[in-house]
Amino acid sequence: MEQVNELKEKGNKALSVGNIDDALQCYSEAIKLDPHNHVLYSNRSAAYAKKGDYQKAYEDGCKTVDLKPDWGKGYSRKAAALEFLNRFEEAKRTYEEGLKHEANNPQLKEGLQNMEARLAERKFMNPFNMPNLYQKLESDPRTRTLLSDPTYRELIEQLRNKPSDLGTKLQDPRIMTTLSVLLGVDLGSMDEEEEIATPPPPPPPKKETKPEPMEEDLPENKKQALKEKELGNDAYKKKDFDTALKHYDKAKELDPTNMTYITNQAAVYFEKGDYNKCRELCEKAIEVGRENREDYRQIAKAYARIGNSYFKEEKYKDAIHFYNKSLAEHRTPDVLKKCQQAEKILKEQERLAYINPDLALEEKNKGNECFQKGDYPQAMKHYTEAIKRNPKDAKLYSNRAACYTKLLEFQLALKDCEECIQLEPTFIKGYTRKAAALEAMKDYTKAMDVYQKALDLDSSCKEAADGYQRCMMAQYNRHDSPEDVKRRAMADPEVQQIMSDPAMRLILEQMQKDPQALSEHLKNPVIAQKIQKLMDVGLIAIR
């Protein structure tokens, strides 16, 4: 067992300094020696979570609970992994199960509160996603009349699929009316009352819940430390950093087991721009926090501050590393947003650093050789690498589109042709290859349009002229069955989107029952464009 303890301590030390792989190796070796040690599985679960391997973190959390069902930490590990996996309902149940064994465990209590809040928020955030949405709107006279307007239905579907757009749509009185119906409250009257209403009863008790009364139970040194901290906070707010440091240092001397005073000092050095000192103090604070079993939220704050210091220095890779460590301890929206911001910047930096026109030319030539030999998959790989090296070269997209066409991946070919044309609108090959892909898909009307654009650029282009003639003859001679027309049309993503739109389906039903309704719908340019698309592919015909 001595060897197991040594490996565990070695793993703990590696984890505390961020050497996650070393920590995992130590814990795994210790588990081989002592496979029934619940603490080892708990520690390895934490390591996997910090690495971002949440499935394995979950598995180790489950094993911890199996081995020690009355230990609250095991449930915390399991629930945290479930939270990272976005399995919030299961995480909530896990926290509840843990509290049955340790009713006063603050970590489990806080975790349960977070889960309940997130689940409630998730349900409220998208009231447009209820299964009986249209029945509810149809049953209320305030929204029944709105349903006859296709633009209203489009708006509802947009919010149904993307609730984050709600904030930008609240100026639309139709949306406020809809929310009133869906939520069962009169939002209009609420707006008027809020201007004169006094604060609701619940907030005052929250204001009264201050830490000061608890000081009666604290030892004298901790009371004095808290007073010094408050003096330091006052000085910090006034940007009197030297005075703030003195008070925080005094608080630390009075209560050396409280990591908060050290992280407060780190905050001062962060504001002063001394990021190395800030990080040094945060690492020290984490060490003190671990030794004294500090709340994970405090550990997370220290890691986040280290991440912020690297972000300020534009060392985004290091910033991401410590943001992830913070999120593994305690997940907060602010840190998650900052981490995503750093990841976005780093990804763009790496993309720009990867650009090299000379290497792009080498890859292009290799792709051309493979294309000539008929090895289209390999040619596509070389062209893809060339595009990464020089994403502004239109000819590379054109070449890859030719590969996709040979491989019968016509939608991908069209996408590359669009990119090619956007980068170089006068490049004939972009148009002829796009038209060739459309011709292969038997979309002759569109293909002729694109061949015509190529001829507008160069009237002597034989490839475009021949293609136009072929499509014209094919269109004249085609005798497709209705099934063939439908199958070909439904292969078009744009048609799929139109036909899956409930508003458009309603309009098409109305057109079948009442042909006169068409003239009203065609007044809406968006609807008219969609109907024209369905006519072009042969799905509908207007007599």
Swiss-Prot record:
Primary location recorded for the protein, binned into one broad class: cytoplasm
UniProt subcellular location: Cytoplasm; Nucleus; Dynein axonemal particle
Cross-link (Glycyl lysine isopeptide (Lys-Gly) (interchain with G-Cter in SUMO2)): 123, 210
Record field: transmembrane: none
Entry-annotated residues carrying N-acetylmethionine: 1
SMART domains: STI1, TPR
Residues carrying N6-acetyllysine: 8, 301, 312, 325, 344, 446
Span of the annotated motif Bipartite nuclear localization signal: 222-239
InterPro entries in UniProt: STI1/HOP_DP, STI1_HS-bd, TPR-like_helical_dom_sf, TPR_2, TPR_rpt
One annotated GO biological process: cellular response to interleukin-7
Region (Disordered): 192-233
A Pfam family that the UniProt record links to this protein: TPR_2
Phosphoserine PTM sites in chain numbering: 16, 481
Keywords: Acetylation, Cytoplasm, Isopeptide bond, Nucleus, Phosphoprotein, Repeat, TPR repeat, Ubl conjugation
Cross-link named Glycyl lysine isopeptide (Lys-Gly) (interchain with G-Cter in SUMO1), sites: 123, 210
Keyword Cytoplasm appears in the UniProt entry: yes
Modified residues (Phosphotyrosine): 354
Residues carrying Phosphothreonine: 198, 332
Superkingdom of the source species: Eukaryota
Record field: compositional bias (Basic and acidic residues): 205-233
Known role: Acts as a co-chaperone for HSP90AA1. Mediates the association of the molecular chaperones HSPA8/HSC70 and HSP90.
Domain notes: The TPR 1 repeat interacts with the C-terminal of HSC70. The TPR 4, 5 and 6 repeats (also called TPR2A domain) and TPR 7, 8 and 9 repeats (also called TPR2B domain) interact with HSP90.
Subunit organization: Probably forms a complex composed of chaperones HSP90 and HSP70, co-chaperones STIP1/HOP, CDC37, PPP5C, PTGES3/p23, TSC1 and client protein TSC2. Forms a complex with HSPA8/HSC70, HSPCA/HSP-86 and HSPCB/HSP-84. Interacts with PACRG. Interacts with EEF1AKMT3. Interacts with HSP90/HSP90AA1; the interaction dissociates the PPP5C:HSP90AA1 interaction. Interacts with FLCN, FNIP1 and FNIP2. Interacts with HSPA8/HSC70. Interacts with HSP90AB1; upon SMYD2-dependent HSP90AB1 methylation.
PANTHER family: STRESS-INDUCED-PHOSPHOPROTEIN 1 (PTHR22904:SF523), TPR REPEAT CONTAINING PROTEIN (PTHR22904)
UniProt name for this protein: Stress-induced-phosphoprotein 1
Organism: Homo sapiens
Source taxonomy: Eukaryota, Metazoa, Chordata, Craniata, Vertebrata
